[in-house]
């Protein structure tokens, strides 16, 4: 029987892994869902699969009560649980909408398999599990180029650690910079640093040699991940490794740094490569006396690998980190990310453009004159991109709520009245900005002293 403290630690690790994995899957699902048209059944079904797996991980994490983890982590678990409950309902709503558009068919390969989540074992060491989810259909059939066969990518890499990392390779998709609304300064900086050097490498040498570490920071829900994907999409033959913090961690001493080493070796074998690490602050925060030996050794290995990458003129590698807490990153880590770009909430013009784009893209009928659009742009001050998407979804439901169940049953979508400014006003009572002004000012102050902003 496990000691109570070890059981509490095990419960927390199980919760945290499920939390991180659910967040990653749902974020990936939303990205695919939002950029694909309603006629793109293949991509919509991929998004559905992401949502289903995300829901299972949400439910797995929510089964663990805060009082079952060790005391110093209970407030964190409570906070995450509240957010997960909201996200779970939102994800179920998205999945339900897609299932109505694309009913399940017999003998489809995209049928979802139960999540095989492995709780960390305290009693005996096992091989580190880099990814505890089943491989999604999006990543299952990776189309490697001739130079990027599995054997070539794993050259000089322990398959035990490198094999699961290959599942993080994303196939090139059609996300482009032009698909992203707002964030003009960030897009321009990324184009100069990443995209243009691939067009004419000889021009970008010497003092014009691009940075190999970029930090995207800003409030959540403003497209940091989508920007990184757009960079990979614009670069054509570049391999894109989308690595979560959970994929780089292991509680067994010695394994975490081997995972980091394997990651960079795979990136070198398949270069040019972009390594994208979301929530980088969760694994590379400032070093202190209380951190574990595992964490300290992993950070040291990451620094060594970054130094090796920066000192080599032959390596065509780029590491992009994303965080909403840049001030918590270790100073030595920050030095490896000389390009630090604030991804702020959209301004009035970008907010209006995003709202109108969503309405038009989804073929949602609306009645908004020029003056009303300007009013709506002013009302939504402080809303993030994801907040605006949620607001549009809520506003689209208002006309339906005016109808009886009988009316809804016999109504076709084209007969539904258009969305008005009043509908958005009602929706704003339910959908509030997820980012407070205090957080924004803190991030902008950081950008003014240590980063780049508009």
From Swiss-Prot:
Keywords: ATP-binding, Cytoplasm, Cytoskeleton, Isomerase, Microtubule, Nucleotide-binding
Pfam families: AAA (PF00004), AAA_lid_3 (PF17862)
Places the protein is found: Cytoplasm, Cytoskeleton; Cytoplasm, Perinuclear region
Substrates-to-products reaction catalysed: n ATP + n H2O + a microtubule = n ADP + n phosphate + (n+1) alpha/beta tubulin heterodimers
UniProt EC number: 5.6.1.1
InterPro entries in the record: AAA+_ATPase, AAA_lid_3, ATPase_AAA_core, ATPase_AAA_CS, MT-severing_AAA_ATPase, P-loop_NTPase
Location (main, coarse): cytoplasm
Residues bound to ATP: 218-225
Subunit structure, as described in the record: Homohexamer. The homohexamer is stabilized by ATP-binding. The homohexamer may adopt a ring conformation through which microtubules pass prior to being severed. Interacts with microtubules.
Family designation: Belongs to the AAA ATPase family. Spastin subfamily.
Its biological purpose: Severs microtubules, probably in an ATP-dependent fashion.
Protein known as: Probable spastin homolog Bm1_53365
Taxonomy of the source species: Eukaryota, Metazoa, Ecdysozoa, Nematoda, Chromadorea
């Amino acid at each position: 029987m496990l000691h109570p403290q070890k059981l509490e630690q095990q419960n927390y690790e199980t919760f945290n892994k499920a939390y991180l994995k659910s967040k990653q899957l749902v974020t990936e699902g939303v990205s695919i869902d939002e950029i694909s048209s309603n006629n793109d059944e293949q991509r919509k079904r991929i998004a559905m699969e992401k949502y289903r797996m995300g829901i299972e991980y949400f439910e797995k994490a929510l089964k663990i009560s805060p009082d079952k983890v060790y005391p110093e982590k209970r407030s964190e678990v409570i906070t995450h649980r509240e957010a997960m409950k909201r996200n779970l309902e939102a994800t179920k709503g998205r999945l339900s909408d897609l299932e109505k558009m694309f009913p399940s068919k017999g003998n489809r390969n995209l049928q979802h398999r139960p999540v095989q989540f492995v709780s960390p074992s305290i009693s005996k060491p096992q091989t580190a599990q880099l990814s505890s989810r089943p491989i999604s259909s999006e990543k299952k059939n990776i189309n490697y180029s001739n130079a990027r066969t599995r054997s070539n990518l794993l050259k000089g890499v322990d398959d035990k650690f490198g094999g699961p990392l290959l599942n993080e390779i994303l196939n090139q998709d059609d996300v482009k910079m032009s698909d992203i609304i707002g964030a003009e300064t960030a897009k321009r900086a990324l184009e100069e640093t990443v995209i243009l050097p691939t067009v004419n490498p000889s021009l970008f040498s010497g003092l014009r040699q691009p940075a190999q570490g970029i930090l995207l920071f800003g409030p959540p829900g403003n497209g940091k991940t989508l920007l990184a994907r757009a960079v990979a999409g614009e670069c054509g033959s570049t391999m894109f490794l989308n690595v979560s913090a959970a994929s780089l961690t292991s509680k067994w001493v010695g394994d975490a740094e081997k995972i980091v080493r394997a990651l960079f070796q795979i990136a070198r074998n398949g270069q040019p490569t972009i390594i994208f690490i979301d929530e980088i602050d969760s694994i590379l925060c400032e070093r202190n006396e209380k951190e574990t030996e595992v964490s300290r050794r992993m950070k040291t290995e990451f620094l060594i690998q970054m130094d090796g990458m920066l000192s080599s003129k032959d390596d065509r590698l780029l590491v992009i980190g994303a965080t909403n807490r840049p001030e918590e990153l270790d100073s030595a880590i920050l030095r490896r990310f000389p390009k630090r770009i604030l991804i702020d909430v959209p301004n009035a013009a970008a907010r209006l453009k995003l709202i109108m784009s969503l309405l038009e893209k989804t073929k949602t009928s609306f009645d908004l004159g020029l003056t009303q659009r300007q009013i709506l742009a002013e009302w939504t001050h402080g809303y993030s991109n994801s907040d605006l998407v949620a607001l549009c979804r809520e506003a689209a439901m208002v006309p339906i709520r005016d109808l009886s169940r009988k009316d809804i049953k016999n109504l076709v979508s084209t007969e539904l009245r258009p969305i008005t400014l009043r509908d958005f006003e009602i929706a704003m009572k339910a959908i509030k900005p997820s980012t407070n002004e205090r957080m924004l000012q803190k991030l902008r102050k950081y950008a003014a002293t240590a980063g780049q902003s508009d």
